Amino acid sequence: MPVQTAVVVLAAGAGTRMRSKTPKVLHTLGGRTMLAHSLHAAAEVDPAHLVTVVGHDKERVGAAVGALETELGRPITVAVQEEQNGTGHAVECGLSALPADFRGTVLVTAADVPLLDGHTLHALVDEHRSEPTPAAVTVLTFTAPEPTGYGRIVRLPHDGEIAEIVEEADATEEQAAITEVNAGVYAFDAEFLRTALGQLNANNAQGELYLTDVVKIARASGAPVFAAHLSDSAKVAGANDRVQLSRLAAELNRRTVENWMRAGVTVVDPSTTWIDVGVTLGRDVTIHPGVQLLGTTTVGEDAVIGPDTTLTDVSVGDGASVVRTHGSESTIGAGATVGPFSYLRPGTVLGASGKLGAFVETKNADIGAHSKVPHLTYVGDATIGEYSNIGASSVFVNYDGVAKSRTVVGSHVRTGSDTMFVAPVQVGDGAYTGAGTVLRFDVPPGALAVSGGKQRNIDGWVQRNRPGTPAAEAASAAGPHHSSDLHETEKQDLKDGIEQ
């Protein structure tokens, strides 16, 4: 029977150096919380049991774990460390959440090392089981030129094997000079770990139960202790404050961008491009400077994104072009063009080969294939059919002060500039509207809708009502000009109406 693996993720710390109301492990980078990064990596080991130890703000962190259960599609047990009494105590809490008869490998990792990946955890487990007699403990180590803050790996002089891990606060001057340090990631034999945890004591500078003391206990009992040395130290770098978090975010992004370039994506300026780990890109995508692709955004093959574009949870079809656009929770069809300066709000669906042009804002809008909204338009709560064109400066008036209503525009519709669609209203297939039309009623298919009366001019209105202004002086200098004659009553009616 294959040896089973259980993973215990430590997420109980307060993270006071973050100086935040948000628990440290719930701070984000690359579109995921540090906790999510750790649990994703743990899930790649395909453990029989996955446990997260929570403590500080346990309700909030526990809720985040619950959400990740759904995301990962596997159960995650939450163990509570009520009193923060060191890493040894935290692991004891996690171990108590495992079945009492569990006899496999216990992998222990931390929730604040977001670059640690499943490949590294697999390698640690393989090293732990590599000998005919499996190790009691296998420690992941790395070399740190500046080892401040890390536990030092003390090796035996005669064979170079690990003798103990000494925490910095307890290290002698000679031990403090050691540059091989503890990464805080371990593989344990479950039976040995249960026994060793019962032998821990708090006789140290911190007055806590150190998990690292388990190594010394193993050595004293003659149990095998292995080490797996990691050359890529960034994978186990922690984030204790926001400065460290920002550095890790930049490093994670650098790796993500480079991975996509190696996979066939052109990134013109990697230094100004940010791509979350949940993003998916097709081959031959081109990303111009100043682009942020966030959340679960997907971009199809041959699409061109940017410059200066932010897309969050947006699906972009093959061959589409998106320029200087801000979009979220939207769909852009294959071959469509968006921008510059477009704003796609949640619920926007742009069909294949459609167009949203300069200074167009959309929300809850379904715009059919080959339809165009070229410029200066708001489309909210609307359905537009195929091959339609919405004139410049049009507004879909979707809110009456109490509730929102929907506008439906058919296919092959042409609307003039400055058309107002006062919802709820429907425009039939093939209909036209004149410029400046206010649509308050449905338009039948093939009809031309025009609102407003005949233009009428009131001669001399500016000179009479705005005397002394530059406009009045300019009008007087232009000389007398008379519009078509109006009945005196009409003139007075117009004069009164405008002056009101």
From Swiss-Prot:
List positions binding UDP-N-acetyl-alpha-D-glucosamine: 10-13, 24, 81, 86-87, 151, 167, 182, 240, 345, 363, 378, 389
Location of the region described as Pyrophosphorylase in the Swiss-Prot/TrEMBL record: 1-242
MF term (GO), any? magnesium ion binding
Catalytic activity entry: alpha-D-glucosamine 1-phosphate + acetyl-CoA = N-acetyl-alpha-D-glucosamine 1-phosphate + CoA + H(+); N-acetyl-alpha-D-glucosamine 1-phosphate + UTP + H(+) = UDP-N-acetyl-alpha-D-glucosamine + diphosphate
Residues reported to bind Mg(2+): 112, 240
Q: What does the record give as cofactor?
A: Mg(2+)
User: By its UniProt entry, which InterPro entries does this protein fall under?
Assistant: Bifunctional_GlmU, GlmU-like, GlmU_C_LbH, Hexapep, MobA-like_NTP_Trfase, Nucleotide-diphossugar_trans, Trimer_LpxA-like_sf
Q: Where is this region: Disordered?
A: 459-500
GO cellular-component terms in the record?
cytoplasm; membrane
| Biological processes per GO annotation | cell morphogenesis; cell wall organization; lipid A biosynthetic process; peptidoglycan biosynthetic process; regulation of cell shape; UDP-N-acetylglucosamine biosynthetic process
Q: Which Gene3D superfamilies match?
A: Hexapeptide repeat proteins, Spore Coat Polysaccharide Biosynthesis Protein SpsA, Chain A
Instruction: Determine if Signal is one of this entry's keywords.
Output: no
Annotated segments matching region Linker: 243-263
Where do the annotations place acetyl-CoA binding? 392, 398-399, 417, 435
- Catalytic site: 375
Query: Could you tell me where the Basic and acidic residues compositional bias lies?
Result: 482-500
State the compartments where it is located. Cytoplasm
Matches recorded under CDD domains: GT2_GlmU_N_bac, LbH_GlmU_C
- Chief subcellular site? cytoplasm
Report quaternary structure and partners.
Answer: Homotrimer.
Entry function: Catalyzes the last two sequential reactions in the de novo biosynthetic pathway for UDP-N-acetylglucosamine (UDP-GlcNAc). The C-terminal domain catalyzes the transfer of acetyl group from acetyl coenzyme A to glucosamine-1-phosphate (GlcN-1-P) to produce N-acetylglucosamine-1-phosphate (GlcNAc-1-P), which is converted into UDP-GlcNAc by the transfer of uridine 5-monophosphate (from uridine 5-triphosphate), a reaction catalyzed by the N-terminal domain.
The entry's protein name is Bifunctional protein GlmU
Q: Whose protein is this, by species? A: Rhodococcus opacus (strain B4)
Please name the gene that encodes this protein.
glmU
